[in-house]
């Protein structure tokens, strides 16, 4: 497909559909969806990416979900991947507020998931995407039934969340919100060498992403802006409020990486204890990007995923024609 990209090591899963959809505030989002490999669907999984990621990075995950009988919907958040970039410098990861991401998710639900794929609808989300998923779950009306989150951004590793929120808030107030938050000079984070990385121990999967971005640098991203970091930390502190626990009405499973060095596992554990509908599993040895990890860690994750999402009622096992289309003839 013209708006999806592949490499020899990362082919587009068969049956792909892709299109751009427009948000109410005028942002163009790149979306993709697949129906399952079998002739019936167990429902739909929405895959929500982390910061600086793109649809292509999740092709392997898409294939694994399709083999399990799910339709899959995924998309690039505004400001990254193939969606509308937020600033004149397209390599800066920027939003003014995380509520903009909720607009993206609601748009994709309305324009892609609901009209093209069958219920039940569940979410699989990573890091930044996981934080957005929790914000979405707290809204009064959501069609999502369950969520599986990997390494959610509930706080930064090292306990710097509050301090950095205050500092970035001051700088943002002074009009510096579009500056890089750190020593970035437009270098694409996906092109950094494998050695010393903090996201995966699997060199093959790491190099697969590097190869993709080398071939299609327009999908890559550099560092976040001060405004992005401030908004992310504000969202994390909101999720940590005691009253937020009463606003998550659906079951959530969180997968924590045992060798996590980006987000705070302690914050995840505290979050799990506060909310009775949330459970967690720690995958010893895994690094931050569990879905991009070595198979021995991913197998643990997928076993937990399968047990948690479970087998829907037979009533949901419908042919994967688009909702609203005429039923297939016997």
Q: Where are the predicted features?
A:
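Short beta-strand/loop motif that positions the catalytic acidic residue
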Residues: 248, 254-256
């Amino acid at each position: 497909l013209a708006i999806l990209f592949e490499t020899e090591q990362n082919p587009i899963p068969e049956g792909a559909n892709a299109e751009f959809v427009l948000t109410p505030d005028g942002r163009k989002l790149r979306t993709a969806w697949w129906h399952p490999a079998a002739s019936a669907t167990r429902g739909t999984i929405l895959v929500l990416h982390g910061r600086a990621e793109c649809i292509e990075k999740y092709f392997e995950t898409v294939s694994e979900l399709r083999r399990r009988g799910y339709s899959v919907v995924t998309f690039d958040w505004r400001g990254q991947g193939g969606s509308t970039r937020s600033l004149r410098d397209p390599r800066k990861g920027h939003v003014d507020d995380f509520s903009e991401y909720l607009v993206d998710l609601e748009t994709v639900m309305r324009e892609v998931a609901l009209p093209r794929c069958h219920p039940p609808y569940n979410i699989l989300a990573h890091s930044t995407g996981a934080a957005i998923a929790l914000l979405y779950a707290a809204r009064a009306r959501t069609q999502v039934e369950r969520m599986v989150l990997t390494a959610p951004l509930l706080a930064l590793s090292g306990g710097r969340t509050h301090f950095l929120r205050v500092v970035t808030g001051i700088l943002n107030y002074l009009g510096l919100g579009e500056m890089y938050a750190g020593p970035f000079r437009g270098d694409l984070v996906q092109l950094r060498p494998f050695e010393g990385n903090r996201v995966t121990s699997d060199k093959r999967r790491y190099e697969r992403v590097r190869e993709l971005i080398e071939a299609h640098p327009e999908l890559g991203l550099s560092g976040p802006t001060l405004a992005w970091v401030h908004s992310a930390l504000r969202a994390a502190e909101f999720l940590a409020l005691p009253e937020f626990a009463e606003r998550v009405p659906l079951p959530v499973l969180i997968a924590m990486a045992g060798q996590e060095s980006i987000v705070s596992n302690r914050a995840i554990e505290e979050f799990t204890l506060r909310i009775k509908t949330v459970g967690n599993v720690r995958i010893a040895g895994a690094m931050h990007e569990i879905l991009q990890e070595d198979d021995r860690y991913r197998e643990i994750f997928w076993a937990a995923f399968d047990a948690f999402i479970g087998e829907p009622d037979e009533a949901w096992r419908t042919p994967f024609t688009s909702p609203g289309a005429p039923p297939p003839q016997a």
